[in-house]
C-alpha cells in the first residue's frame, strides 16, 4: 500500500529520516510530539512536498504528485486544511458529490445526524470538535481504500475524540482491505485503535 525507503527531508532547523511499510488492511499510527515530523511524513506520502532523498511508493505509484485515479482512492484529513468558513454542510455535500463519483450521499446525511452537524449553519460557527468531525466524515464518505488523517483528535474533549475513533473503527470494519494512517501526539488514542505504531522523533 505505502512504502518509504530511506526517505529524507531537511529544513533549516529540522530533518526527518524514514523507512517503513504500511500494508493493506492495517491501521498504522505515527505518534510523536508536536514538531517531530508527523505532518511532514504525511505530506511526503501525499506528494505535497518532495523528499530530498529516498523512494516513496503509494498504490504502486512511485514519486511525485499522485495521479487523479490514485487520489480518488484516498480520503484525507489535514489539520491545516478544510473548507471555506463561509460554507455550510450542505455546500460541502455538493462539493464532495462533484469531486467523487463514489460519494455516499445517504451515508453522509446519516452521519451528520449522528454527529449533530447542522446542515445550514456556516462552518465559521462550528466548534473545534464539530469541524474535526466534519473533516473526518468528508474523508470517509467516498469509499476510500486508504485514509490519511493528520491529528484528527487534536484539541478535542473525550466525547468528541471517542466519536471520531468510533467512526474509524466502523469504517475499517466494513472492509478488511481498507487501510488507515493516523497521526497523533496522544499515544492512548492510537494504542486503542492501531495495529502498528511508529514513534516519530
Language-model regions: role of each:
Residues 161-176:
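Helical segment within the ABC ATPase nucleotide-binding domain
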Residues 72, 78-135, 142:
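ABC-family P-loop ATPase nucleotide-binding domains
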Residues 46:
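Helix-to-loop junction immediately C-terminal to a conserved catalytic motif
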Residues 147-151, 156:
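Catalytic Walker B motif of ABC-type/P-loop ATPase nucleotide-binding domains
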Residues 33-37:
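Walker A (P-loop) phosphate-binding loop of ABC-type ATPase nucleotide-binding domains
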Residues 1-19, 24-26, 67:
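A short, flexible loop at the N-terminus of ABC-type nucleotide-binding domains that lies
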Residues 54-65, 69-70:
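Conserved ABC transporter NBD signature motif
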Residues 197-201:
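H-loop (His-switch) and adjacent beta-strand-loop-beta switch element
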